[in-house]
Amino acid sequence: MENNNEDKGAIRMIVPIPCADKFFRLWLEVLKPQHQLTDRETDLLAAFVAKRHELQRTNLSQDMIDAILMSSQSKKEIRKSVKISTAYFQRIMAKFRKRDILIPDSNIKGGKINPRYIPVLKDDDKNIGILFMFIDPNGT
């Protein structure tokens, strides 16, 4: 763990967390106050975000990535990987739309994942880095 005190009393720390396949699930746990999904729903969203990240490693446009992610073939693969029934999958997808986790896009049937739930990653094939800034609401 690296701790670097810089100007104005800011504390910066690097904390390595081995998480491999659980990264996107952990990311969504941090965002739980925003989405308030159940564990099973969070697992499904994490599978979508992980698949999207995998697709981002290609040279495809963002629109193409979103279209592939929301294709019936990708949805079926993701549903099977999370081991949920088709009916339950459809209920969760409806809930995602209702809560703006999936947002409308005229080019993509069923919408696309709200960028709020997609982490902006610095990806070097071995490590994924995310910067969290916890801001004091009182400004102190």
Task: Identify the residue ranges that each predicted region occupies.
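Short glycine/proline-centered loop/turn elements that form peptide/ligand docking sites
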Residues: 71-73, 88-91, 111-114
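Positively charged, structured surface patches that bind polyanionic biopolymers
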Residues: 1-36
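Short helix->loop/beta-hairpin flanking segments within DNA-binding domains
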Residues: 37-73
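Short helix-coil junctions and helix-kink-helix linkers
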Residues: 65-87
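Minor-groove-contacting beta-hairpin "wing" of winged helix-turn-helix DNA-binding domains
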Residues: 108-120
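A short, conserved structural fragment
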Residues: 84, 89-90, 94-109
